[in-house]
UniProtKB/Swiss-Prot annotation:
InterPro entries for the chain: DNA/RNA_pol_sf, RNA-dir_pol_luteovirus, RNA-dir_pol_PSvirus
Domain RdRp catalytic: 199-325
Post-translational modifications: Might be cleaved to release the mature protein(s).
Name recorded for this polypeptide: RNA-directed RNA polymerase
Purpose: RNA-dependent RNA polymerase which replicates the viral genome.
PROSITE patterns linked: RDRP_SSRNA_POS (PS50507)
Organism expressing this protein natively: Mushroom bacilliform virus (isolate Australia/AUS LF-1) (MBV)
Keywords assigned by UniProt, alphabetized: Nucleotide-binding, Nucleotidyltransferase, RNA-directed RNA polymerase, Transferase, Viral RNA replication
EC primary class: transferase
EC number: 2.7.7.48
């Protein structure tokens, strides 16, 4: 895959300063030679310059994961009360990686946790509306809450690259930085128009993408991140990124009742991992590029012929797309070709033209709005956000939304009255 379409950033500043003070190379990891030549262990003080930035960008009200949930109910509480402890653990995590070296890649998920390479991952059902079909089938959306220390480790390694991709989303095959404002919608539609000059645009729906990610795809993402940072394959940064890819695909899961389950089949992307949006986007691009190669199809299209935001994508269709994605472990639930871009969909939006799109399904957005109490001080702000999100809905559909919302509110009021 041509990494030239992704922004090149250089290594993280803290890492560059630290690694240049060390001697030896990756081939010495875990050996007596390496230990004798290495400087003293990495300490939390080296992160002093970036600590504030990292903590500012961490979502404060998110779950801190296991075992840090024992210290506080959310990230903010844990960092406020135990910040120094957390950063000491971050430094210890890096030192544990260096201490075990290549032996990490033969560890079981349980051994990774026991040896302090990573923490177990807390899983729970996402608090959002699920369709009756999914409820009856037991296909509920599972969230994997990665522990706070692991979140910080990943941010230290990947924040610089992830932010660069967000800033460059218009010219990059990955689009984590895309917006659904009118300018963002125009850019996306223009991109689809350019691609449509080279073939028919299609959109695909991969069944359970996160759980279908293969270990080699996680490893490929780590390799590309190393190249984009301008670092050597086999160097320190590459080693840390390889470890991250390995622990993501070899997890211990903590159930809500405390039961722990060890992953036996490598692979899968953790929904709560800091890299999920960025890595899923890149791996979705990699999957199409590999499928195209296996199908013997030409490449060299604008943006590699695909635009991806997480597992959502639109791309130039080719014969064998569904077949070869399936052979790679990604079951294609739906592949719709859109000749002339008529009604093409991306990120749950139906595009009608340049800068015009509306939600495919408005029910979840409406549900979230109705969950706010009218007495909430920000209620008018929430309403304005809702109407902006629905700004391009056809008038008949918008009236349907308003009637539906009114009916739901009336029903809720009756239920509340009867219960009292």
């Amino acid at each position: 895959m041509d990494s030239g379409l992704y922004p090149k950033t250089g290594a993280p500043t803290w890492f560059y300063g630290w690694s240049k003070q060390r001697e030896g190379g990756f081939s010495d990891f875990g050996s007596e030679i390496f230990r004798l030549r290495a400087l003293p262990p990495l300490k939390a003080e080296i992160f002093r310059g970036i600590r504030e930035v990292v903590e500012y960008n961490i979502t404060g009200d998110s779950h801190p994961g296991y075992p840090w949930c024992k210290l506080g109910s959310d990230n903010k509480a844990v960092l406020t009360g135990f910040g120094d402890l957390i950063w000491d653990e971050v430094a210890k995590r890096f030192n544990n990686m260096l201490g075990y070296g290549d032996a990490i890649f033969s560890m079981t998920p349980s051994e990774l946790v026991q040896n302090g390479i990573c923490d177990a991952v807390k899983v729970f059902i996402k608090q959002e509306p699920h369709s009756l079909e999914k409820v009856n089938a037991g296909r509920l959306r599972i969230i994997a809450a990665v522990g706070l220390v692991d979140q910080i480790v990943t941010r230290l390694l990947c924040m610089k690259q992830n932010n660069a991709e967000i800033d460059c989303w218009e010219s990059c095959p990955s689009a984590p930085g895309m917006g659904l404002n009118d300018e963002g919608l125009r850019t996306l539609y223009s991109t689809a128009q350019v691609m449509a000059e080279h073939g028919t645009i299609c959109e695909t729906d991969i069944s359970g993408w996160d759980w279908s990610v293969q270990q080699w795809e996680l490893d490929s993402d780590a390799r590309l991140r190393t190249q984009l940072a301008g670092e050597e394959i086999g160097g320190y940064l590459n080693f840390f990124l390889r470890v991250h890819a390995y622990v993501v695909g070899h997890s211990v899961f903590v159930m809500p009742d405390g039961e722990m389950l060890e992953q036996t089949v490598p692979g899968g992307q953790l929904s709560g991992d800091y890299n999920t949006s960025s890595s899923n986007s890149r791996m979705r691009v990699i999957a199409t590029m590999f499928a195209r190669y296996l199908a013997g199809q030409v490449s060299g299209f604008p943006l590699l012929g695909i635009k991806a935001m997480g597992d959502d994508s639109f791309e130039i269709w080719f014969k064998g797309l569904e077949e070869y994605l399936g052979k790679m472990g990604h079951t294609v639930k739906m592949c719709v070709q859109r000749p002339g871009l008529v009604g093409f969909e991306f990120c749950s939006q139906v595009f009608l033209g340049l800068g015009i799109a509306y939600p495919v399904d408005f029910s979840k957005t409406l549900y979230r709005f109705l969950s706010h109490h009218p007495a909430d001080p920000k209620y008018s702000e929430y309403r304005a956000q809702l109407m902006y999100y629905f700004r391009h809905l056809p008038s008949s559909t918008l009236q349907k939304v308003i009637r539906l919302a009114g009916a739901r509110v009336e029903r809720a009021q009756k239920l509340a009255t009867s219960s009292n």
